[in-house]
Amino acid sequence: MPGSRRVRPRLRALLLLPPLLLLRSGHASDLTVAVVLPLTNTSYPWSWARVGPAVELALGRVKARPDLLPGWTVRMVLGSSENAAGVCSDTAAPLAAVDLKWEHSPAVFLGPGCVYSAAPVGRFTAHWRVPLLTAGAPALGIGVKDEYALTTRTGPSHVKLGDFVTALHRRLGWEHQALVLYADRLGDDRPCFFIVEGLYMRVRERLNITVNHQEFVEGDPDHYTKLLRTVQRKGRVIYICSSPDAFRNLMLLALDAGLTGEDYVFFHLDVFGQSLQGAQGPVPRKPWERDDGQDRRARQAFQAAKIITYKEPDNPEYLEFLKQLKLLADKKFNFTMEDGLKNIIPASFHDGLLLYVQAVTETLAQGGTVTDGENITQRMWNRSFQGVTGYLKIDRNGDRDTDFSLWDMDPETGAFRVVLNFNGTSQELMAVSEHRLYWPLGYPPPDIPKCGFDNEDPACNQDHFSTLEVLALVGSLSLVSFLIVSFFIYRKMQLEKELVSELWRVRWEDLQPSSLERHLRSAGSRLTLSGRGSNYGSLLTTEGQFQVFAKTAYYKGNLVAVKRVNRKRIELTRKVLFELKHMRDVQNEHLTRFVGACTDPPNICILTEYCPRGSLQDILENESITLDWMFRYSLTNDIVKGMLFLHNGAIGSHGNLKSSNCVVDGRFVLKITDYGLESFRDPEPEQGHTLFAKKLWTAPELLRMASPPARGSQAGDVYSFGIILQEIALRSGVFYVEGLDLSPKEIIERVTRGEQPPFRPSMDLQSHLEELGQLMQRCWAEDPQERPPFQQIRLALRKFNKENSSNILDNLLSRMEQYANNLEELVEERTQAYLEEKRKAEALLYQILPHSVAEQLKRGETVQAEAFDSVTIYFSDIVGFTALSAESTPMQVVTLLNDLYTCFDAVIDNFDVYKVETIGDAYMVVSGLPVRNGQLHAREVARMALALLDAVRSFRIRHRPQEQLRLRIGIHTGPVCAGVVGLKMPRYCLFGDTVNTASRMESNGEALRIHLSSETKAVLEEFDGFELELRGDVEMKGKGKVRTYWLLGERGCSTRG
């Protein structure tokens, strides 16, 4: 085997020991597995701390299945393949194997994993006729069965890497030459040497191409420089096996030398994915990132890099196996097993042991023995097996077919992701559907230069032409030159003519002033999307909390927006004329159309297309407008399309992009305004709220300039777009920072300082996609070069919004439907609010006036006074109220009356009565009107009076809780006249002698007693249940002597109230 070391002489003598002398007695039902692996050094993928838990899991499954090795017990014995320094040894491993063979006579050996340890042990086991299983020893030489007759490899092998590279070359059309570079580590198991050996031998065998190879030493910059010169002379397709840091350093030097992805491709042979931090590692995987100040260059260099790793299984059995493996490793082996591609090695040992047990079981069933190593080994070869690592296929040479993955960098995010998978069994390359190989030129570079590495192609060396060819060439060039010069002269003349014509000029007299309110009246009762018809957000300014909107006017019959320019005069220099020409040349549906300009002092102004739906800022801040994500993405796409046109045109950049400069027209199309014409822009005030509020969208590098360019920069526009994107996503205002209430001045100062991390608005991943948040962060990156251009932003938005149609009509109809739905919701909301207010007003009206009277007034009818033949009126007051009021504060008196009348109002709700009024401590109630109830009015009032009296006895005065409130009640029955009096604060009043008499009954009564007139007593006697007591004749003012009664109660009925 190339690169393998010679076995020492004393080990050769051990091979001569007769196998029979090594056999020791044991139990017939015991099957011994001898393990020879590193026992202390856990850095090896096949260390015992990693493989031991897998072996125990495999033996556990054997015990759980009665069909495997019935009647047999599997036991393990251990031997170390390490030397005293903890490194794999070609001496320690064979000695351990001999000791295990002599003492335990094992039926099978498990391991070693290191190549130099496995080589002598593999030769011994072939001599002893004992099978050897390993998921390591991946070198090409271990596959030579003349020496390793009974070795079966259930893990990856490097010759299979050559199969993957062969398929890759065939797919990409590389049929001539490749270069292989590797860092050889002589002190250990030389992993890169054996990786390159397998690739080199298999590719040369299968493709018959030239494969050059070069060894190098890691950490030597001079050596790296010489290595890159070799790359320039011998390769365009380069395979490099080294540590991740060395590969990154090489890529940086390659970038400096001009070896970029247009002409070169570098494959990192990183089979265990160390540069990717493990296949299950953190996302995104960025092997170029180190935070050492070189990341930006490294990311650029890695556009020419791809990474080759083993393919990690993703079947459910493997994922469940990993959980059990980690738990057992931690619990029993005191080892914390991390995620990564190294875990496929213990999984392959697990599957290999199960495959061996299956082969032994079959051998025993056919009359064989566990010591028949050749028969058992042949049963494992050329066989398929379903294990935890998925579909396991051992070929006819005893090597497992290995799957590989190819990783490539996403140019937008810089993260590496799998783009191709190789199936080792079918020898097929399978593309990952959502990812594609990235090539800077759109296609892979050729494996040899166009003219060869040494410019040896004859087609590139024709250094002379015939006379006729020279004349033809000169004549053609002369003609083309003449046509080009003529074309440019014509263009120059047309341009001068257009500049002189001043087609943009507008006379102030041609403008007909018009307020937006008048325009809306002439257009009918149209509603705008923002709900504010007078708003033209593209030209608004803010001063404190007040908004001043641009004026409008009619020009040639069309309504236009008029922006006044705060300048005394505009000098029409050639620069200004070109600015005006460029504005007239703008024709894009996502940019407001430039109508013209007036430069006549003092009426200097700019006329642009008027958009009636308002600005994006107004729409976002109006909480009554519902915007789903389809609508938001549509508005965002409109901004991107407009900015793409600006950046690719003569204007070049906006310089003042913000949500208030994005307006919505009548067709719900968002348009960008206030672009170009930097000579017309108002000089900024030195300080004030307005200045800082305007700068919330400005990029930090422009804020730090003493005199930033009026046109801004393209990277600055991307930053402004990122701020707008956050406004659209959160709808919480411009530069919203959760938990902080900062003024615009404070925000601008923190952004300008350049804090680490940079001070930026908040994001809420619950309200938008994580990818959208990443796009925001890229747009407002501190380094302008890290911000994506609008072309990349457009592609990213397409990924977020795949389900929405790109058809203009479909988008317009969707916006119209969204707008209609929003209007329906708004009308429904306003209707419900109106009905609620109407209900409250009616409830208040019914408390002031009787229900029937209130209904008449609501219908607009005049309430006529009405006479009632018989009603019962109740009067009450508080005895000693005047003295009590004098001894109390006004607030205490108000509280007392409020508590008392609240109690009374709750009681009278249980009776057919109407409360007429309260005056001070006087309380007046009537029954029998406005709805007549026959003779029931006397009974209702009598019962109510008893209930009120009962309530008063338990009533407590807040500021005099020990004092009893003394209520005096008078009741009288008779005719009255009732009606509504007055137009302002109308009141329902009662008139007639009955009212006066009832009042006299109350004033001549006694505290805590109910005083009745004889008329009321006569009506109550009809109900036969009230207890009355004659009081006698009482002298009343204006009435003379009147016979009255006391109401004591009602028989057979508890007092209500």
From Swiss-Prot:
The keyword GTP-binding applies. It comes from the Eukaryota. Keywords: cGMP biosynthesis, Chloride, Disulfide bond, Glycoprotein, GTP-binding, Lyase, Membrane, Nucleotide-binding, Phosphoprotein, Receptor, Signal, Transmembrane, Transmembrane helix, Vasoactive. GO terms for biological process: blood vessel diameter maintenance; cGMP-mediated signaling; dopamine metabolic process; negative regulation of smooth muscle cell proliferation; positive regulation of cGMP-mediated signaling; receptor guanylyl cyclase signaling pathway; regulation of blood pressure. Phosphorylation of the protein kinase-like domain is required for full activation by ANP. This is Atrial natriuretic peptide receptor 1. Residues 872-1002 form the Guanylate cyclase domain. Residues 29-469 are extracellular. GO terms for cellular component: ANPR-A receptor complex; membrane; receptor complex. The chain crosses the membrane at residues 470-490.
